[in-house]
């Protein structure tokens, strides 16, 4: 019955896994979306999970810590994921190759084959931040032909680009 009502009234739920290297801005994004304000964060050991409702869609967002020692645990969160939000610190040119390797490791896992991919090109407010087209190239996204992906420029602290990213997820998710 719930599925019938959600079809009629347009309420959808989406399981989102938010990953990225440490200090990319994942937790800041999660709580900016949830609370509408910037919060002081500490490095996430483990995960945060929150439900964010936007445009009649309930996003169940799992924000998992990004330190290199925690990354092997990411795969334990893959099952049932419908959308991947991969957050990149656009000012961190030294680690963009590391980000690319991690992204491709995630999306090549069979548990993630059906997930659509949103890249938040975060920290666009910082000087010398890489622009979306540069992120697209450096992450090797143009070679991904069999998946639905999108790069959204963002600034977690101001909220710029965050809701546009959620809009893309709602428009491209097929339940």
UniProtKB/Swiss-Prot annotation:
State the UniProt keywords alphabetically: Cell cycle, Cell division, Cell membrane, Cell projection, Cytoplasm, Differentiation, Endosome, Golgi apparatus, GTP-binding, Hydrolase, Lipoprotein, Membrane, Myristate, Neurogenesis, Nucleotide-binding, Protein transport, Transport
The cross-references to PROSITE patterns, in alphabetical order and at most eight, read: ARF (PS51417)
**Activity regulation behaviour:** Activation is generally mediated by a guanine exchange factor (GEF), while inactivation through hydrolysis of bound GTP is catalyzed by a GTPase activating protein (GAP). Activated by ASAP3. Inactivated by ACAP1 and ACAP2. Activated by NGF via NTRK1. Activated by PRKAA2 through its C-terminal regulatory domain.
Residue positions bearing lipid (N-myristoyl glycine): 2
GO terms of molecular function: G protein activity; GDP binding; GTP binding; GTPase activity; signaling adaptor activity; thioesterase binding
What EC class is this? hydrolase
- Single GO BP term: negative regulation of receptor-mediated endocytosis
Pfam families from the entry? Arf
Give the lipid-moiety residues, type N6-myristoyl lysine.
Answer: 3
Q: Which family does it belong to?
A: Belongs to the small GTPase superfamily. Arf family.
Role summary: GTP-binding protein involved in protein trafficking that regulates endocytic recycling and cytoskeleton remodeling. GTP-bound form plays an important role in the transport of multiple palmitoylated proteins form the Golgi to the plasma membrane. Required for normal completion of mitotic cytokinesis. Plays a role in the reorganization of the actin cytoskeleton and the formation of stress fibers. Involved in the regulation of dendritic spine development, contributing to the regulation of dendritic branching and filopodia extension.
PANTHER family for this protein: ADP RIBOSYLATION FACTOR-RELATED
- Quaternary structure? Interacts (when activated) with GGA1, GGA2 and GGA3; the interaction is required for proper subcellular location of GGA1, GGA2 and GGA3. Interacts with PIP5K1C. Interacts with USP6 (via Rab-GAP TBC domain). Interacts with RAB11FIP3 and RAB11FIP4. Interacts with HERC1. Interacts with ARHGAP21. Interacts with ASAP3; the interaction is stabilized by calcium ions. Interacts with NCS1/FREQ at the plasma membrane. Interacts with TBC1D24. Interacts with ECPAS. Interacts with MICALL1. Interacts with SPAG9 homodimers, forming heterotetramers. Interacts with CYTH3. Interacts with ASAP2. (Microbial infection) Interacts with the V.cholerae enterotoxin subunit A1; this causes a conformation change so that the toxin can bind NAD and catalyze the ADP-ribosylation of Gs alpha.
Q: What is this protein called?
A: ADP-ribosylation factor 6
| Provenance organism | Homo sapiens (Human)
């Amino acid at each position: 019955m719930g599925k019938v009502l959600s079809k009629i009234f347009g309420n959808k739920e989406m399981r989102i896994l938010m990953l990225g290297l440490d200090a990319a801005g994942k937790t800041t994004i999660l709580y900016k979306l949830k609370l509408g304000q910037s919060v002081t964060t500490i490095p996430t050991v483990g995960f945060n999970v929150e439900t964010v409702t936007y445009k009649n869609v309930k996003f169940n967002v799992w924000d998992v810590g990004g330190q290199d020692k925690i990354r092997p645990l990411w795969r334990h969160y893959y099952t049932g994921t419908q959308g991947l939000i991969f957050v990149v610190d656009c000012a961190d040119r030294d680690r963009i190759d590391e980000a690319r390797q991690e992204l491709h490791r995630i999306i090549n896992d069979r548990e993630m084959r059906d997930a659509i991919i949103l890249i938040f090109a975060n920290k666009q407010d910082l000087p010398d931040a890489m622009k979306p087209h540069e992120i697209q190239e450096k992450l090797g996204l143009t070679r991904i032909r069999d998946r639905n992906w999108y790069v959204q420029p963002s600034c977690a602290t101001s909220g710029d680009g965050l809701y546009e990213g959620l809009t893309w997820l709602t428009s491209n998710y097929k339940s």
